[in-house]
């Protein structure tokens, strides 16, 4: 994963039952974990435009169409 890469964030992250596409804005690497900020293409139903993800298993690379 790298900044600027298109990804899909699992629905469990936002809790709205929808997988969200977006772009990685920042990656913070710490001793035992990485934190990834993703900006979504469209807002979640409650108006948030992104997520901070600590479980990297909840992010996958978006496949080209």
What are these regions (language model features)?
Residues 31-34:
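Short acidic/glycine-enriched loop/turn segments that link adjacent beta-strands
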Residues 6-8, 21, 37:
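Beta-strand secondary-structure signal
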């Amino acid at each position: 994963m790298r900044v600027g890469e298109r990804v899909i964030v699992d629905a469990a992250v936002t809790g709205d039952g929808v997988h969200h596409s977006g772009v990685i804005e920042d990656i913070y690497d710490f001793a035992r974990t990485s934190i990834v900020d993703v900006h979504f293409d469209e807002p979640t139903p409650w108006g948030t435009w992104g997520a901070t993800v600590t479980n990297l298993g909840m992010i996958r690379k978006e496949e080209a169409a």
